[in-house]
Amino acid sequence: MKYKLLPCLLAILLTGCDRTEVTLSFTPEMASFSNEFDFDPLRGPVKDFTQTLMDEQGEVTKRVSGTLSEEGCFDSLELLDLENNTLVALVLDANYYRDAETLEKRVRLQGKCQLAELPSAGVSWETDDNGFVIKASSKQMQMEYRYDDQGYPLGKTTTSNDKTLSVSATPSTDPIKKLDYTAVTLLNNQRVGNVKQSCEYDNHANPVDCQLIIVDEGVKPAVERVYTIKNTIDYY
């Protein structure tokens, strides 16, 4: 029997120090920020990350970079959108995120480090008892967000004037592969698009490389676009 145990003991000795305890849940801050700033949420003790979206020609179209504290607060967040020629860079300062260049107060926070208000746009956010942002509102629109039991964003519904835009996501049943998902977009209950994503994962159950297929069904014939997402993630 001891000979049968030997390979197991060797495996433990060789790998035990490198074993990673996988966190399957998403923090309220990570889930809510990913909703608002349009990036894939990550799990575990993330220190910093860069998420890059590339088109079929390998050209970068969007990039999101963030640094987080050990408590899971975003210390900084940078969003580059080359398709729309925009760049937003935010840094944490007490109860606000300031513009990294002008130091103007851009986003007011609530609780530990959760979104509360975007004064320049007249947008305010509401949270549930667990700290997840579940509603955003302004004079022009209302948005409601949905999450599963692990805090994974399941979509949102936006109402503005006489239009209702709803995005509903269905993640993989494998809790490790949460970022493998399909999603459907409805405009006034009419289907106008769908999305499918599949990824490779690291040992924290976070996506490293993903293929994202976006189909615009609002035009005839439908237009399909294929993107690649590259994630670079450092952990505490």
Swiss-Prot record:
Subcellular compartments: Cell membrane
Keywords: Cell membrane, Lipoprotein, Membrane, Palmitate, Signal
Lipid anchor positions (N-palmitoyl cysteine): C17
GO cellular component: plasma membrane
Lipidation (S-diacylglycerol cysteine): C17
Signal peptide, first to last residue: 1-16
Alphabetical list of InterPro entries matching this protein: UPF0257 (IPR010646)
Membrane topology: Lipid-anchor
UniProt superkingdom: Bacteria
Family per record: Belongs to the UPF0257 family.
Stated name of the protein: UPF0257 lipoprotein YnfC
Organism, as annotated: Escherichia coli O127:H6 (strain E2348/69 / EPEC)
